[in-house]
């Protein structure tokens, strides 16, 4: 069985509840808010070859893929060049520096 993508409708409007942070070279999930996540109430069937865009704060979930067919997912994180991006962020890696789409 290939689990269906589920999202919490309107969940992106709530507070940031958790974030990933590098601590001593290891990734940890940090709790920021005790407010429970909203229920994932919307099933999003995604056909092969589709593109799905999710807001960074949208709670989403997918059950484990137990089928014999792989379910590939590629993630692109877009960050405004004018924002301060903390060194402790889990995406910041000296071995793989972030690249800009714009030549300054």
Q: What is each residue range found by the language model?
A:
Residues 1-58:
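Double-stranded beta-helix
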Residues 20, 51-53, 57-104:
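Non-heme Fe(II)/2-oxoglutarate
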């Amino acid at each position: 069985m290939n689990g269906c993508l589920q999202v919490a409708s309107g969940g992106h409007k709530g507070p940031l509840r958790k974030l990933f942070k590098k601590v001593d070279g290891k990734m940890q999930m940090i709790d920021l808010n005790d407010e429970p996540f909203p229920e994932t109430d919307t099933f999003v069937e995604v056909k092969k070859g589709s593109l799905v865009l999710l807001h960074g704060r949208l709670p989403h979930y997918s059950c484990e893929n137990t089928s014999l067919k792989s379910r590939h997912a590629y993630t692109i994180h877009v960050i405004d060049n004018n924002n301060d991006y903390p060194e402790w962020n889990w995406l910041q890696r000296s071995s793989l520096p972030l690249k800009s789409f714009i030549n300054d």
